[in-house]
C-alpha cells in the first residue's frame, strides 16, 4: 500500500463511520504553518459542521523499513503545536522498534488498520 492509499483508507473509514453523525472529511488541507515555519498540509481534516469542531489526522504507513521512521518525532511535535486537536494514525510492518516504542508511548498516535 502506498502512503496516499493509506490516507484515503483512513479518510474513507472516518467518513463511513462518522459521516452519518455530521462529520465531513477533507484530505490534503492547508492549515497554517508547521513548527519550522513551512506551510502545513494536513493529510485529513474531520470537521463536525454542527459546532465546527475539528480533528487533524496525519496518516503514516510504512511496510518496509525506510525514512518515514525519521519523520515521526517531528510529526508528533508538529501535532502538539497545532491549535486544533490532532492525531497521528499509523500502520504497516516496516517501523523500527525504536519508532514503534515512540508511537506506542505517544498520546497523539494510534495504530489503525481498517479492513
Task: Specify the residue positions occupied by each region the protein language model found.
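Acidic-basic catalytic patches of nuclease active cores, encompassing PD-(D/E)XK
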Residues: 1-33
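Charged, structured surface patches that assemble and position nucleic-acid processing machinery
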Residues: 104-115
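Active-site metal-binding core of divalent-cation-utilizing nuclease and nuclease-like domains
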Residues: 21-51, 66
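Catalytic cores of nucleic-acid endonucleases
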Residues: 50-55, 60-106
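Hydrophobic beta-strand scaffold residues
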Residues: 25, 86, 109-111
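Residue-level "edge-of-site" marker
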Residues: 31, 92, 115
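Phosphate/oxyanion-binding active-site loops and adjacent basic polyanion-contact surfaces
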Residues: 6, 37, 67-71
